[in-house]
UniProtKB/Swiss-Prot annotation:
It comes from Arabidopsis thaliana. This is Signal recognition particle 43 kDa protein, chloroplastic. Component of the chloroplast signal recognition particle pathway. Required for post-translational targeting of proteins into the thylakoid membrane but seems to be dispensable for co-translational targeting with a translating ribosome present. May be able to function independently of cpFTSY and FFC/cpSRP54 in targeting LHCPs to the thylakoids. Acts as a highly specific chaperone for LHCPs, preventing aggregation and being able to dissolve aggregates. GO terms for molecular function: disordered domain specific binding; identical protein binding; metal ion binding; protein domain specific binding; protein-macromolecule adaptor activity. The keyword Ribosomal protein does not apply. Gene3D superfamilies: 2.40.50.40, Ankyrin repeat-containing domain (1.25.40.20).
Length: 373
């Protein structure tokens, strides 16, 4: 298989049980910091932290001069690197540019507050995040369900991927639905290619997940960094998947299912102007169609073309634009109503069966006739 996606990182985060606090380094010099919120700029003995939203406030206590004794100097050196004690993380949310913030429960009883991840010891973040990402990378529906409370379902890893992208790539439509119901962004793009959950499901050949995402409202027109939609990506992979290799047969079948689901969504709301050409037979028949919105002609599988349009093409009927109805009569069979139609692209008017004439034009014609007709 040609690698279109980057392999998902399944490495768990390491927890250092010896660390459980936010560390503030002592100042390296007496010069003022360029940031008013930089803890490194504060000559502290003990700091009480209180982050509220994006605001970091620090209360400084007076710094006492050390004595000449070695014991007191060591004590001051130790206290100059004090900590704001963390009890645990109780919530998370995404910040700008893929950064994370965590709701901290403090050991000193201070009100919980939001703190940027960069200010929190790695072991504290790891203890909170590891179960979540382990569950996501295993598509563990039960574990994800238990961990959802007070957590941002759109939390991102180092590659900007959410849990939804992982479970989509792993093929768990149950996990996809669980996360979607929890409010997951169905169209989130990662930072390693601009891939969405739909791209992941298409690229890893998960037709059931593709169908679920489409049903849930995922935008099939979202493009990755190469400008490819999930449908275009699936087509690209199918082209590079060997036809004669028995080992790839199942993969090709899966890709065709993915493409069929996505094509069905693309053409569901597209209106065909006319069929230009036909190729293939039976279930493999395709039509080259011209769209009413003026888009380029495209080859479309027969199942996605309205039956009446396909039948008209097969019967040799052509489409033209009617300008108005200028006459009415009963057909040769004595029953069928026919209308004399004036065309925009033809000089001669023609008699057409009622079924072939726009009902709006028929109504306008009838309104123009005397009441006794």
């Amino acid at each position: 298989m040609q690698k279109v996606f980057l392999a998902m990182d399944t490495c768990a985060l390491v927890i250092h049980q010896s660390l459980s606090r936010i560390k503030l380094s002592p100042p390296k010099s007496s010069s003022s910091s360029s940031s008013a919120f930089s803890p490194e700029s504060l000559p502290i003995r003990r700091i009480e932290l209180c982050f509220r939203g994006a605001i970091c406030a620090a209360v400084q206590r007076n710094y006492e001069e050390t004595t000449s004794s070695v014991e007191e100097a060591e004590e001051d050196d130790e206290s100059s690197s004090s900590y704001g004690e963390v009890n645990k993380i109780i919530g998370s949310r995404t910040a700008g540019e893929g950064a994370m913030e965590y709701l901290i429960e403090w050991k000193d009883g201070h009100s919980p507050s939001w703190v940027p991840s960069s200010y929190i010891a790695a072991d504290v973040v790891s203890e909170y995040e590891t179960p979540w990402w382990t569950a996501a990378r295993k598509a563990d529906e039960q574990a994800l369900s238990q961990l959802l409370e007070d957590r941002d379902v759109d939390a991102v890893d180092e590659n900007g991927r959410t849990a939804l992208l992982f479970v989509a790539g792993l093929g768990s439509d149950k996990c996809v639905r669980l996360l979607a119901e929890a409010g997951a962004d169905l169209d989130h793009r990662d930072m390693r290619g601009g891939l969405t959950a739909l791209h992941m499901a298409a690229g890893y050949v998960r037709p059931e997940v593709v169908e679920a995402l489409v049903e849930l409202g995922a935008d099939i027109e979202v493009e990755d960094e190469r400008g490819l939609t999930a449908l275009e990506l699936a087509r690209e992979i199918l082209k590079t998947t060997p036809k004669g290799n028995p080992m790839q047969f199942g993969r090709r079948i899966g890709l065709e299912k993915v493409i069929n689901v996505l094509e069905g969504q693309v053409f569901e709301y597209a209106e065909v102007d006319e069929i230009v050409e036909k190729r293939g037979k039976g279930k493999d028949v395709e039509y080259l169609v011209r769209w009413k919105d003026g888009g380029d002609c495209e080859w479309v599988k027969g199942v996605h073309v309205a039956e009446d349009v396909a039948k008209d093409y097969e019967d040799g009927l052509e489409y033209a634009v009617a300008e108005s109805v200028i006459g009415k009569r009963v057909g040769d069979d004595g029953k069928t109503i026919e209308y004399l139609v004036k065309w925009t692209d033809m000089s001669d008017a023609t008699w057409e069966p009622q079924d072939n004439v726009d009902s709006t034009l028929v109504l306008l014609y009838q309104q123009q006739q005397p009441m006794n007709e």
